[in-house]
């Protein structure tokens, strides 16, 4: 597989509007990125926006190909045509935002091989779930920087890049994004997710203001398309009150299992469940503070008893009626994650054609964007390439 950490992105003349961000914002972001990387002989005028299509979100970067949430995975996602890259954010003990999918890091780093950290292994309750392992909030940034990333799904995906890349901070990701956008000659959006916000606030490490401060400190992310996402409700409401509506930063309400509750609601012993939030009345409430929803794929098109795609739900239609965009998660290129009619071969086998076919079935429902572990396949699905 080609590794593109320092290489220019493919299809450099193409960029998407994503969350319907104005052309002027894209142009400003592009010009800012080109100012940082002046060797790119391209201007906003020479690269006009294509007609709006569904935006491709690189889920944890190109995480099907490289260890997730590494700069290498983000570079690959950009090279493969992602319109946005997604860093999930957790906190260090010394108050730095770093990119990991969860604060327990034994599944995505080599922390278990470090004898100096053996006594950091512990058990905690995170959003109502007992979890054993090593947690970012028990490490300083300097300590985390001694660890290497590794593949989360070694039974499915290559481990060839294990031990090559370090954990990245949000500051590093933003700086890297500016450089990559300049090399690619196109605007690239950022879709950070606040992970376990109520938990971190409860231990004295609140995330929301630090995230906004970091984004507003960089000229690129002051104007580039940014979408902050969360499975919680309270932090999105807070961010809306802080940011208002006149901002380049949009808010995405993620939706978990309908039987479950948002982490902040659970902590407050509230009664709201995700099932309540996907009703027309619930969607109207979300529209009061967010710009879109991020449901699971099967909330949009459920599977039937045979594991095939069934009849689409009314969620996309209902969300659009409430003025919300719909950005489902997550398309993955291995058979085991696909609806039955798109599978070909053994469950653990990579199946690009099947993944593209499944994406197109969902695109037909009118979704506005989607998360994928393999942005190159997402690009094929959106652009109509075989």
Please annotate each region the language model reported.
Residues 4-28:
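Bacterial N-terminal signal peptides that target proteins for export
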Residues 2-5, 41-386:
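Phosphate-group recognition and catalysis centered on beta-loop-alpha active-site segments
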Residues 14, 20, 33-34, 65-68:
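Residue-level recognition of conserved structural "scaffold" positions that shape functional pockets
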Residues 27-37:
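Bacterial N-terminal signal peptides
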């Amino acid at each position: 597989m080609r590794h593109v950490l320092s290489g220019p992105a493919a299809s450099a003349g193409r960029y998407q509007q994503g969350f319907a961000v104005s052309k002027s914002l894209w142009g400003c972001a592009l010009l800012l990125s080109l100012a940082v990387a002046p060797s790119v002989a391209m201007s906003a005028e020479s690269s006009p926006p294509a007609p709006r299509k569904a935006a491709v979100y690189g889920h944890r970067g190109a995480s099907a190909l490289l260890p997730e949430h590494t700069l290498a995975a983000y570079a690959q996602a950009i090279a493969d045509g992602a319109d946005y890259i997604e860093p999930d954010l957790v906190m260090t003990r010394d108050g730095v935002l770093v990119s990991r999918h969860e604060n327990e890091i034994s599944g995505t780093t080599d922390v278990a091989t470090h004898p100096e950290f053996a006594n950091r292994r512990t058990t905690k309750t995170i959003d109502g779930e007992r979890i054993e392992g090593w947690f970012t909030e028990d490490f300083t940034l300097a300590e985390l920087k001694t660890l290497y990333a590794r593949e989360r799904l070694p039974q499915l995906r290559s481990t060839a890049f294990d031990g090559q890349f370090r954990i990245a901070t949000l500051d590093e990701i933003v700086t890297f994004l500016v450089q990559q956008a300049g090399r690619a000659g196109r605007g690239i959006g950022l879709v950070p997710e606040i992970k376990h916000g109520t938990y971190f606030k409860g231990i004295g490490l609140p995330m929301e203001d630090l995230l906004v401060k970091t984004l507003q400190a960089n000229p690129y992310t002051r104007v580039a398309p940014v979408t902050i996402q969360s499975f919680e409700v309270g932090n999105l409401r807070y961010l809306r009150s802080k940011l208002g509506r006149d901002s380049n930063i949009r808010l995405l309400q993620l939706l978990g299992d309908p039987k479950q509750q948002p982490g902040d609601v659970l902590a407050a012993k509230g009664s709201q469940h995700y099932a309540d939030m996907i009703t027309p009345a619930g969607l109207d409430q979300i529209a009061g503070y967010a710009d879109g929803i991020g449901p699971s794929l099967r909330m949009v098109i459920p599977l039937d008893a045979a594991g095939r795609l069934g009849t689409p739900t009314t969620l996309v239609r209902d969300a659009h009626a409430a003025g919300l965009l719909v950005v489902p998660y997550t398309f993955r290129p291995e058979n085991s994650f696909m609806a039955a009619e798109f599978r070909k071969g053994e469950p653990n086998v990579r199946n690009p054609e099947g993944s593209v076919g499944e994406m197109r079935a969902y695109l037909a429902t009118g979704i506005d964007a989607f998360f994928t572990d393999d942005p190159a396949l997402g690009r094929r699905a959106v652009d109509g390439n075989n």
